[in-house]
Amino acid sequence: MMMSDLSLDLVEEILSRVPATSLKRLRSTCKLWNALFKNPGFTKKQFLKAPKESLVLMLKEYSVCPMIANLSVSAPSIEFKGALNLKNYPPYSEEVDIHEACHCDGLLLCTTMDYRIVVWNPCLGETRWIRWPKNIYSRFALGYEKNKYGRIYKILRCWDRHNSPTGRVDEFEIYEFSSDSWRVLDLVALDCHIASHIGVSFKGNTYWLASDKKDKYGLLLCFDFTTERFTRLCLPPSQDVSKMALSVVGGKQLSLLSQSDSTSKIMEMWVTNIIEDVLMWSKSFTVDIPIRGDYCPYLTSYLVDEEKKVAVCYNENFEKSNKKVYIIGEDNGYYTEIPLVESSYQVWGYPIIFNYVPSLVQIEEGGCIIKE
């Protein structure tokens, strides 16, 4: 039996179980299928039913680059593929330099080097440029409100109106896609310093490392896009949140990398568990980094494979010659340093490594909504 002999409902049911990257390749093969892939009803069904194909992306030299990590014990390695090019808005067509990026449900929220922001679906090649009152000390997060209609995507803007890069945040705004406008969040105040510039998106909310303004202890700060409020959560015992980094494991758990200080070669990996609606931390594994000398690399972005007990980490170092990716595993089963080959100009920004799951989520004028 040919696909053309099947009913449209059955074809839709079959295709809704195909990953987004495969559907992208099918768009040009059939006009009917291409129209189906643009149908919001099909997009919602496919998002919920299709298996999630995770890609590793790295923000490198102002571009988002796919990265393949070979985690074999005998010869671990890293391979970079061609960059995913973000184009300027029409009628311009030049590539845009990306300064920061965060992601949620296959959408990337990017800040450009000229202080513009754009929501980008690399799988579909769609973009939505967002107008905002520019302030270079703003930070952004992408998440979604959960209600009976599904997921309604929003952008949070945190702004230090004193124009000081101290992490002190005073004002908060929400961007709504449906109205293409920003609104101020009233009665929202923080009594902590946000330590990590880029938040981690997890199940629609955004998480940052932070420290209490008065007592200086470390904490996990969560912004709930449904209630539009901040919540404090606990962290594992540690000396300094500036020596920590956050990540997500398989879309199911938060992960924390903890280093005690710049001279310690001991690195701990923690993961979250939810027990009776309370977030709890458990230690996953510990690594004694086999590095020579007194200085241990400051690892600011990473991905972890819980099954293999291995992490792929990036060190924050603005000296071009010292930029490296590390593959580090439990009991020193893995250890590889991979220098990054970059151009001659100095790279300033917030390099990150993250898991990205391509999706058909559309950036619509009426707002981005996924029905649960």
UniProtKB/Swiss-Prot annotation:
Protein's UniProt keywords contain Ribonucleoprotein: no
InterPro entries: F-box-assoc_dom_typ1, F-box-assoc_interact_dom, F-box-like_dom_sf, F-box_dom, Gal_Oxase/kelch_b-propeller, SCF_F-box_component
Kelch repeats: 155-204, 245-293, 324-372
Pfam family, one: F-box
Keyword Nucleotide-binding appears in the UniProt entry: no
Domain F-box: 1-50
SUPFAM superfamilies according to UniProt: F-box domain (SSF81383), Galactose oxidase, central domain (SSF50965)
Keyword vocabulary terms for this entry: Kelch repeat, Repeat
Domain of life: Eukaryota
Protein name: Putative F-box/kelch-repeat protein At3g22730
Organism annotation: Arabidopsis thaliana (Mouse-ear cress)
